[in-house]
Amino acid sequence: MAAHSGGAFPLARRARTALRRVPVWTWRLMMRSVSSRERVRFNTDPVTEVAYVHDLDYVGDGLRAHRLDVQTPLSVAQTSAEGAVARGGSLPVYVYFHGGGWTSGDKSALTKYCANQALGGMVVVNVNYRHAPRFHMGHVLEDANAALAWVVANIKEYGGDPARLILGGDSAGGQISALLTAISRRPELAAHYSLLPAVPAGHVKGLVQHCSAVDFSVFFESGFVLSLNFVRMLLPATAPLTPARLKSAAGYLSPIEWLDGSHPPVFVTTSERDFFYRSNLNFIARLQDHGVPVDALVYPWASANTEHTWQQDYRYPESQEVYRRLHAFVGNVAGPPAGAD
């Protein structure tokens, strides 16, 4: 099957022949050029065995950045929520955050990806959030936490179990979901972002990471593709930081720094073609150091389809393998509904 050639990261690789590192403004232009094409390509031949509810406002301010979609297997959607819960039939909930370098992207490009996961026996919540550089990481995590609060309050109506959550995302969205998982377990990180976690730590049963930015130390390595302004834009506006202070501040953006033995199991997918390959390998190793169960699917360079965030494109056999492994992962970590025999 033909290699993935339409995404922003192959463009970024080519741009690096002219630029030592890709700056934020160049990234935003590249994303603008590919986003509409990705939305069409990734959603060809919609999944019909899933019920779709689009653009639910999880904050109440009418912003598109504060909308989410819910996708439920038809077998559950056609049954009243009360009946499903009474039979102990509520499903685990997979809450997903899209990527886009924190500056771009939209949940609409992930509709079919999310539907394919719903087919695996889960309710899927597909979340938008505010983007940098207008908003910093504190705002993004505030949105993500608000989305979880909405899930806790409302997901039973869609057949989901708010006590069996799996968080996930790709690229920047993976970093958001990983930080949110850490915030549920690390009070000092929650305090840093002035957040009261919307979900008890024990209700987050697992974490899914697709080509995620989980170790920010790679931004400071020679030859990394993205400029340090990606780090700066995620921090609150301050006087310019020295390199040492910028690296210290990046620790609060870097999920790897907040891992411990209490972390839930993780499913990681990456490849040697992924710009965050080293970041993901470091994350896997740190999880293993802490004794956290981790299922890692890592493709070699020879797998030409596996450019950064290939998982969104259902046409690739490598994506189908991700989906099979993800379904099994959720089934293994979610556990039975409360009160089930």
Language model: regions and residue ranges:
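Alpha/beta-hydrolase superfamily serine-hydrolase fold, recognizing
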Residues: 2-341
